[in-house]
Regions:
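Conserved nucleotide-sensing/catalytic segment adjacent to the nucleotide-binding pocket
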Residues: 37-40, 44-103
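Conserved lysine of the Walker
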Residues: 18
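ATP-dependent NMP and nucleoside kinases share a basic, alpha-helical "lid"
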Residues: 111-170
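Short hydrophobic/aromatic beta-strand immediately N-terminal to the Walker A/P-loop
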Residues: 8-11
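Post-Walker A helix-loop "phosphate-sensing" segment adjacent to the P-loop in P-loop NTPases
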Residues: 27-37
């Protein structure tokens, strides 16, 4: 923990509502004139989109499953290093995962690729992380020990799946069938690596549906 360079981490799975909490913090920071270093958890994915597909197939050949929910598809060591360095000096290295064609075009890259690693601005007041592993523990890696405030977006899985299906099909170019397969492939890592983090957070928030979410895949036409 660091009084001089505090870290806030918002942790939750795809579709959990973490982006809404992030926006709330952005409004607070703007009003209070707080300069934040915004970190996306996807920056620490180990593979770009094309290579990830290859690695998923390779894992299946070995009777294994690989997903971004688990540690093997991510640089958790680099994320821990960032948190350690920022808490100590207010600096560190990060990058971006370019999810959509629109964002990728701004970088002159293809969607699903990663930008080069870059040093954070040295004049920030705090670091705000939003991603899958803000409270993760894996072997000797203990990311949960660094944030001064850990917020968990706890599961409401049917609502999460509905939001993920809508986002990935409308913004990221996936078919509904592909998103459904992705959800199924991630289930083991969801149980073993995502949900345990919510016992380490300081505050947990759960989104409540105001519409029928009984069958997230009921409108699947493929």
């Amino acid at each position: 923990m660091s009084e001089e360079f505090p870290i806030v981490a918002i942790t939750g799975a795809s579709g959990s509502g973490s982006s809404s909490i992030t926006k709330a913090f952005e409004h607070i920071f703007f009003r209070e004139r707080v300069r934040a270093a915004y970190i996306q958890g996807s920056a620490f994915h180990r593979y770009d989109r094309k290579e990830m597909k290859k690695q998923v197939l390779k894992a299946r050949e070995e009777d294994q499953e690989l997903s971004h929910f688990g540690p093997d598809a991510n640089h958790l060591d680099k994320l821990e290093t960032l948190f350690f360095q920022y808490a100590s000096t207010g600096t560190g290295m990060s990058r971006y995962y370019l999810h959509s064609k629109k964002i990728a075009a701004e970088w002159g890259q293809e969607s699903g690729t990663l930008t080069p690693w870059k040093e954070l601005d040295s004049d920030t007041d705090l670091l705000l992380y939003r991603g899958l592993h803000g409270a993760a523990i894996d072997g000797d890696i203990d990311i949960s020990s660094y944030p001064d405030l850990l917020i968990g977006m706890v599961p409401n899985v049917n609502l999460e799946w509905i939001r993920k299906i809508k986002r990935d099909t409308s913004l990221r170019g996936y078919s509904r069938k592909a998103v459904r397969k992705m959800i199924l492939r991630r289930m083991s890592d969801y149980v073993h690596h995502i949900t345990p983090q919510f016992s380490r957070t300081h505050i947990n928030i759960q989104m409540v549906a105001t519409v029928d979410t009984s069958d997230p895949f009921g409108v699947d036409q493929e």
